[in-house]
Amino acid sequence: MAVSRFTGKTLNRLAFEPLGTKEKVWFTISDEPNEKYLLKMSRPNTGEHWSEYIACQLCVLLGIPCAEYEILPCETAESHVKRMAVVSANLIENGFMMIMGNEFLFQRFPEKYPTPEESKNSREKRHTVSMVKESLTSVLIKPAWNFPDYFMAFDVFCGYLLLDTLISNQDRHHENWAVLYEECSQLYYLCETYDHAASLGRELTPEKRHILLTSKDKGQQLSTFVNKARSELFEYETDKKPLLTIDALKLALSYQDNNVKTYWINKINYLTEYEIQEILNKIKDEIMDKETKEFVLRMILENKKRILENVN
């Protein structure tokens, strides 16, 4: 089920996580004292908890390496008020260090990319698809991911952009991807994708969702709405706006062999409405109501249609 196995357990707080804009805290539980977990609070009146969970489950279906998320209702100081959160395991194994995209790009291209201190803003025009591709040239992928032998790190990253297009994720900025550095071997590995809360229209009001599903005005329809989704990746650093999610995906795949595109398009083609509905059915109605589930289902299917029509 979507609700976390940690429900009802006492969490032993370790430290706050400073990265990002949301409330986050690292914790352990008595059953697993050596395992660290990250609890990320959902902001009030948003669906950040269910959008994160749904994105994770879609990754499982598509074979995209992803941080695993579970929904956790949390008690607050006011006993009658519950806050929603998601819980994920620590992605950094012993002997590894996580390097965020902005820091890694600066390490690779110190003459081209700003320092992490200079690039605090999530929107950085030098965060281009081609620069990300070039930076990942010598980065490995984990054998446990079971990709075809010809797959390289950027081929997997194309899968991350496929996910972004499918869920209208508009937050693939340069701190929302990372590599893992193994200290003993001095090798770099691509990190699993993470942080997909800014997706699936989680910020929309029920009224807005209803309009998008029922309006006869093309400008107010779901197909028009999803066409506006933008990535935080650019084609050229002189561009005024970042790429649309579909264009970031198309550009990334255009750099790769055709068999990489075929691999990912087949994954999308085989994704069924039934499988998506099953993900939504695992979320209790008090966490995500039926109308919102219907909207999210239609949104994912609309994005699937866009991918199949535009990536060829």
Task: Name these PLM-found stretches.
Residues E68-A77, H173-E183, N312:
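Short alpha-helical "patches" and their helix-cap loops
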